């Protein structure tokens, strides 16, 4: 089966060089991983500019090789399609993303396309500030707020109604007599810049990790499990659009709609402006490029929209973005500062990464003391020396990055950075894991304190078990305390064996949440030490008992989260989901052959090899054994074979195009829960192809191979009545 499937995939892209296919797969995986970190964790690890660069590289690759552009490609998806904490809800009208421009030439090219489409008609442009916040959709029925949801994948978002109700300026009821029967109102929730620094100061005071920027503060505050926490944060909202509108007519221009929104009591931006053409847009962009910090919220660009609603309909949309609107992204901000030192950190997979310590400097509204340098080759390429004055950019107003040195300011005291030959934490000689690797790694995975600390922090984090009160400080205390000499966590397997008695004696350094280094007493300069889990009377702190309760609750997390938490190389949230969905238990994954693993959608050869290598290590298998002994199921019982009939067992189904009543993931889940296998390519072995709007080449191939094709009504028949009934309503080449 594995060979057949791989052959099918290869046949579909025979004209594409293997190098291009491999590069496409790498880029797609990186982009999906970064989207997950951005939308689920509210903690991106790359800048907006770097993410945009990756996405553009993928788009350019697909332009050269259109066969690689599938509906599953990140270029065809609306960002944000991950939900973890809140109930999924569907938007009546889809929320799209925006296409981006980054310079005047690209902006002018967009204007030329609009002019070609609209000809000699009179039209105007509405300019808005692009708020760097969290996109939210408000639904009002007969003037009453009934739901607030995140954008999600554009069709399905997270229900955050209780939290949005805590934002004072969002009315529970629309003002005035003339309110529609149903209206969706789109906007951005943001955290005011003037309050952002105050919040981070309080978090630092409490020993909690501060937010990297105001956007993360808004997202993190809005996605709290307890609405009281949200209510304590000074969140605001700006509305900027209407989705579904029923029971109201007469709007001809978007700028009129904004007047209407304001009359209903909703917060609109005072900065919006209607202009006649490109020169007016350029003027607006230039003004706010120079005055961006005069605005109450962070901005990362300007949104330009065709103002006439009738013409918006004529211009239409692509699968992910309207053609009548464009986002102009400002260049990241840059400042000069001193490069004090280059240090190295060790990650959970042993990767050793240099990072810069700079003299504290304010950039893009926040103070920066550390910046990324990626690897030793990047340090060489940038040409920076320790002691240099360097140009620091907070790219996308998120992740600080060093661009290069100001070489003219060198005085001869600067020195080169030398990558250490040994792990800075355990002393093990560093090495590349395979020939050609740029990154050096510490191979001492079992005993390296840094790797264990980072793995435990990742396991407890939002992407995996999502254990409250368990951050990097707790992970450090449990894996490397000053007292007792034997840490309570020797490896991840000990997590569910923690008790109050094991926690109370622990003493550890008080760590700075930003740098991970011990804090020092401002008077004595000595490193601060604290009893982490006990109060002055030696009793457990309130958070200690809560931590143990949350650890116990984490035993029931879905299998995919445990797989992700094993820190297997190349296995992130997407691959973990694929493995859990296909094999449904940790034992089946361990027993699977490399070929069976590789043939799983979303896995592939490199991940399959890494999984087999991980399970070949004795102490890795011991982690799994300990978790089982502690009562962790390590299987997805909800999809087990013992839960009754699976009417679509043995079927292979391809889903393509846009369905009205299902998201792509929702359709896959509906099929997989009934036993069907969902694949990304059509072959003679495909049982059915389900098609929505804009199905693309897969529909053509299905007709060519005479594979039964189901529209959305036929798909419903398949789910409700089974394959025989679906075959009766399917389309085929003979028809």
Curated annotation (Swiss-Prot):
GO terms for molecular function: DNA ligase (NAD+) activity; metal ion binding. Its EC number is 6.5.1.2. Its cofactor is Mg(2+); Mn(2+). Zn(2+) binds at residues 423, 426, 442, 448. One of its GO terms (biological process) is DNA replication. It is an enzyme of class 6 (ligase). DNA ligase that catalyzes the formation of phosphodiester linkages between 5'-phosphoryl and 3'-hydroxyl groups in double-stranded DNA using NAD as a coenzyme and as the energy source for the reaction. It is essential for DNA replication and repair of damaged DNA. NCBIfam families: dnlj, PRK07956.1. This is DNA ligase 1.
